[in-house]
């Protein structure tokens, strides 16, 4: 086997590495996490990747018992795959059942995504508003 074949990683391994992000650094109510991008033919950051990374960055700031409940994101500008991403996670609220985080993703040119993520304590089902199914 050649040296290149021994060190090659699969696309799934590359994706898992990109979603791990860097080590969080906290200052006041903000946590900063660095990330990188997958290759994309246009040279721009793929939106699905950056929203997944935003959720992963936010999840680093809540207890493991809190699971993702929702995320709402707004793409502000195109990202460049040649530049690292900086995830600024702001702690908006930690309640008994829910946690809320705002994530601002930036590169050298400014914001590329802003999102709000919600997490719910595991095992605490929410209120159901739907009527029961007819028989």
Go through the PLM ranges and name each one.
Residues 1-135:
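Terminal targeting signals and extreme-terminal segments of soluble enzymes
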């Amino acid at each position: 086997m050649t040296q290149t074949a021994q060190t090659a990683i699969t696309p799934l391994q590359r994706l898992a590495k990109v979603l791990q992000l860097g080590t969080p650094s906290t200052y006041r109510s903000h946590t900063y996490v660095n990330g990188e991008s997958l290759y994309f033919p246009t040279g721009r950051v793929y939106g699905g990747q950056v929203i997944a990374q935003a959720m992963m960055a936010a999840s680093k700031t809540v207890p493991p018992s809190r699971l993702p409940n929702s995320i709402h994101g707004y793409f502000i500008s195109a990202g460049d795959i040649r530049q690292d991403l900086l995830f600024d996670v702001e702690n908006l609220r930690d309640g008994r059942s829910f946690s809320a985080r705002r994530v601002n993703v930036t590169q050298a040119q400014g914001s590329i995504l802003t999102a709000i993520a919600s997490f719910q304590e595991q095992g605490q089902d929410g209120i159901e508003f739907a009527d029961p199914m007819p028989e």
